[in-house]
Regions:
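Cytosolic regulatory regions of ion transport systems
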Residues: 1-149
Length: 149
């Protein structure tokens, strides 16, 4: 029997690939659900959302005590996904300062802030860029039909 980040038996890639998602309400939950569906050991920390699909610790993801209770020390990957860039950077810095986490991915809403996040050692994921690329990709077949009409 192999136990993951949340103490729940997992058949995922490995305990070394435990992922902790911090904040993000529905976005954070969906990230956690998709990772869990791919077989990763996943936990979620969020102030207002209690997921039935993913083990969730209710609490402030900027509280080091809550992060410790959620298993941040056992995570090899943390995804910080609150709606505010400044808060995401603060939480990412707390994770780096207090826990030995290999990779910290930070959701960035403003593309202008991606370089700042990268400069301090985190992996930025720009929500604006990802969303706009997804919308354009979905619209492309419809728009190309208009060009041929």
């Amino acid at each position: 029997m192999k136990l993951g980040l949340t103490g729940i038996e997992t058949s995922g890639p490995s305990d070394e690939q435990a992922v902790l998602v911090l904040g993000g309400k529905h976005v954070g939950e969906l990230i956690a659900q998709r990772l869990q569906a791919d077989g990763y050991s996943v936990g979620l920390v969020d102030e207002t959302h209690d997921s039935e699909a993913v083990p969730t610790n209710a609490g402030d993801p900027s509280d080091v005590r809550i992060l410790a209770e959620a298993g941040a020390a056992d995570a090899s990957v943390v995804v910080v996904a609150t709606p505010r860039d400044s808060r995401n950077l603060l939480i990412a810095q707390l994770v780096r300062a207090h826990f030995d986490v290999t990779d910290v991915f930070v959701l960035v809403n403003s593309p202008d802030r991606s370089d700042l996040v990268a400069d301090v050692g985190h992996e930025p994921v720009c929500a604006t860029t990802a969303l706009s690329e997804a919308v354009v990709a979905d619209l492309e077949p419809t728009v190309s039909e208009l060009d041929t009409a």
